[in-house]
Amino acid sequence: MSKITFKITLTSDPKLPFKVLRVPENTPFTAVLKFAAEEFKVPPATSAIITDDGIGINPSQTAGDIFLKHGSDLRLIPRDRVGLRWTR
């Protein structure tokens, strides 16, 4: 089984830290997203992965599919209060 390498950059930090993750190509991308978020100490439930061009990635694919469609350089965006609705 071949492995895929992703470079995931944390966009919320001005220093733009990154992690290099190497995973089997059939790994569910939701697991990659969760692991990357935990490595950066941000909540995985409210985080998203985008491409360098700003295109959102649907995580319900395999790591191999993401790599073929979007390449290896990705960005992690921790989102705060996603879907929160203020009512008074």
UniProtKB/Swiss-Prot annotation:
GO biological process: protein K69-linked ufmylation
Keyword Membrane assigned: no
Residues of the propeptide: 84-88
Gene Ontology CC terms, in alphabetical order: cytoplasm; nucleus
InterPro entries named in the record: Ubiquitin-like_domsf, UFM1
Alphabetically ordered keywords of this record: Isopeptide bond, Ubl conjugation pathway
Keyword Chloroplast: no
Cross-link (Glycyl lysine isopeptide (Gly-Lys) (interchain with K-? in acceptor proteins)): 83
Pfam families, per the entry: Ufm1 (PF03671)
Matches recorded under Gene3D superfamilies: Phosphatidylinositol 3-kinase Catalytic Subunit, Chain A, domain 1
Stored SUPFAM superfamilies: Ubiquitin-like
Function: Ubiquitin-like modifier protein which binds to a number of as yet unidentified target proteins.
Protein family (similarity comment): Belongs to the UFM1 family.
Protein name in the entry: Ubiquitin-fold modifier 1
Organism of derivation: Argas monolakensis (Mono lake bird tick)
